[in-house]
Design a protein with these regions (language model features):
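Long, charged, low-complexity intrinsically disordered regions
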Residues: 1-83
């Protein structure tokens, strides 16, 4: 667990539908890697978990992702660490 996640850039997906969120996350991850970031924070919210499931589904298949986890202090966020 990284208690200093505020050092990572973040994206807030509130208001996005599933498909738009997936595209936005793909672009955000690509941009972060180009900028040399070690990781990012994705804010998907709690709700019904639709965006969270979509984000995690994408992250599981992205070979650039070393690992990801739900933030212990805010379960509406996923922390992503790059390879």
């Amino acid at each position: 667990m990284d208690i200093f996640i505020n050092r990572f850039p973040s994206i807030d997906l509130h208001g996005y539908d599933r498909d738009s969120a997936r595209v936005r996350v793909m672009d955000f991850v690509t941009e972060a890697l180009i900028m040399g970031e070690d990781g990012v924070v994705i804010v998907h919210g709690n709700g019904e978990g639709i965006l969270k499931k979509e984000v995690h589904s994408f992250l599981k298949t992205d070979k650039r992702v070393k690992r990801f986890y739900v933030d212990a202090f805010n379960p509406g966020c996923t922390v992503v660490i790059f390879k």
